[in-house]
Amino acid sequence: MFVGEYYHSLDEKGRLIVPNNFRQLLGETFYLTRGFERCLNIYTITDWNNFSEIISSFSPTDDLMRRLCRFWFSGSVQVTTDKLGRILIPSFLIDYAELYKDVVIIGAGRHIEIWAKERWEEFNKEENILESMKEINEKVSELWKR
């Protein structure tokens, strides 16, 4: 499981250091893709392949799934860390997530998320979190009852 929150900066070439404890779980090569809240997601090769198989198995006549496939596959790249533990983030992903300098790398369970620092701070404003937590807690409570 990926856990924790790390503050880093993108260098002028678009490279980012992946925290060592994350690299140990990811290996040298993994997938980087667009996330749903204008962040980037990192997946292990295994999880990437599993999710890709699931979304590819839906009917090609399903408009919603075609849209998801386009979003998922067109916005993804396989990356490999260099000897310093950095990855090169392509410019189209930097622009998508607005990662122009300071970033926050967070563990999100089975995947990692990379956020622009300002967007992460806005997302985590206390009133936003507290508002969402009630609804989230209700959903989790329902799962525990099963």
Swiss-Prot record:
Residues 5-47, 76-119 form the SpoVT-AbrB domain. Transmembrane segments: none annotated. SUPFAM superfamilies: AbrB/MazE/MraZ-like. InterPro entries: MraZ, MraZ_C, MraZ_dom, MraZ_N, MraZ_sf, SpoVT-AbrB_dom, SpoVT-AbrB_sf. PROSITE patterns: SPOVT_ABRB (PS51740). Keywords: Cytoplasm, DNA-binding, Repeat, Transcription, Transcription regulation. It is found in: Cytoplasm, Nucleoid. NCBIfam families: division/cell wall cluster transcriptional repressor MraZ. Belongs to the MraZ family. HAMAP family: MraZ. This is Transcriptional regulator MraZ.
